[in-house]
Swiss-Prot record:
Coiled-coil regions listed in the entry: none
Localization per Swiss-Prot or TrEMBL: Cytoplasm
Gene name in the database record: frr
Protein name, UniProt field: Ribosome-recycling factor
One of the GO BP terms on file: cytoplasmic translational termination
Amino acid sequence: MIKEIKQDGEARMQKTLEALESTFSKVRTGRAHPGMLSGVMVSYYGSDTPLNQVASVNVEDSRTLLVQPFDRTMVQAIDKAIREADLGLNPMTADVIRVPMPALTEETRRDMQKLARGEAENSRVSIRNIRRDMMNDIKELAKEKEISEDDEHRASDDIQKITDKYIETIDSRLSKKESDLMSV
């Protein structure tokens, strides 16, 4: 009973961590990486389609992404989608699309850092909410006399250790992201 509660809670915490990683991958650091364009939707025969389904996105060099459409007729639509995605990117179009990364100004770096801190805080809150749910489940079991008081305290300590581990992981990922952002 307790084991299932802990496993379920830890799985939810892991998903929160994965969501944070996904969000962090979209925050610009001045270096090119394909994940930056993962949220771009292209109008493909009347329906919005993720960019990675109509083109391959590769890193050409540390400051340039190379977008190669599977269908040559999609070049203009992909170019338009990247420009309208509000990422501050200005693609250059030929047979393939080159997306140079503009250098980040100090102000932009600070804004990106604030964004990263905000996302990390949201993840911490989410982890704490999961902990609260787990603790409530444990207290409910103790209230119904399905587990002993000792088991309740032991489970509470374990849940707190799991929570601390995930909060620490979030903090370390945030500090890594901040150092990436502030390195020129």
